[in-house]
């Protein structure tokens, strides 16, 4: 079952993220406070997947009014390759479409081979003409998964 993500899902979602290799987490944006802020801004584009009450998948997305952005897509390793990730993505894409968004983007680490294959299978294309840049405005610590 896929349902909207709630703030009280945080501890289970964070535990899920830690179980998945290749997640890009940090101690500021992915803290309980950081995720709470994200959910306040994007309440209708963040979802979890459950089986018999066990949280086994999650996806977060938002938009800037023009483009959608997908973040932190994860399915517990013991439940991967069963269509759960695809269902989460399709759910979030439909939610973005309902908000008038016509295109979406995401970032995947180059070393995340399984993640890149997953997104390619779903029709997401790689852009070789772009360089992704970012700048931290506060001190934060990266959390490796």
Please tell me what each predicted stretch does.
Residues 1-15:
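A short beta-loop-alpha structural element at the N-terminal edge
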Residues 36-48, 69:
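A short helix-loop-beta-strand connector motif used in the catalytic cores of GNAT acetyltransferases and
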Residues 50, 73-80, 108-109:
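A short, internal acetyl-CoA/4′-phosphopantetheine-binding micro-motif in the GNAT/acyltransferase core
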Residues 48, 54-62, 69-74:
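Conserved beta-strand in the GNAT
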Residues 106-115, 134-137:
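Conserved beta-strand-loop-alpha-helix junction that forms the acyl-donor binding cleft
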Residues 62-71, 80, 126-130:
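A conserved beta-turn-beta hairpin within the catalytic core of GNAT-like acetyltransferases
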């Amino acid at each position: 079952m896929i349902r909207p993500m709630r703030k009280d899902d945080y501890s289970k979602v964070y535990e899920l993220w830690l179980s998945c290799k290749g997640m890009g987490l940090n101690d500021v944006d992915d803290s309980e406070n950081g995720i709470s802020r994200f959910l306040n801004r994007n309440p209708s584009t963040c979802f979890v997947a459950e089986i018999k009450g066990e949280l086994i998948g999650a996806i977060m997305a938002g938009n800037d009014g023009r483009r959608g952005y997908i973040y932190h897509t994860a399915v517990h390793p013991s439940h991967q390759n069963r269509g759960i990730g695809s269902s989460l993505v399709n759910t979030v894409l439909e939610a973005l479409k309902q908000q008038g968004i016509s295109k979406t983007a995401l970032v995947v680490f180059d070393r995340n081979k399984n993640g890149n294959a997953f997104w390619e299978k779903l029709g997401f294309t790689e852009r070789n003409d772009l360089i992704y840049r970012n700048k931290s405005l506060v001190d934060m610590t990266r959390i490796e998964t």
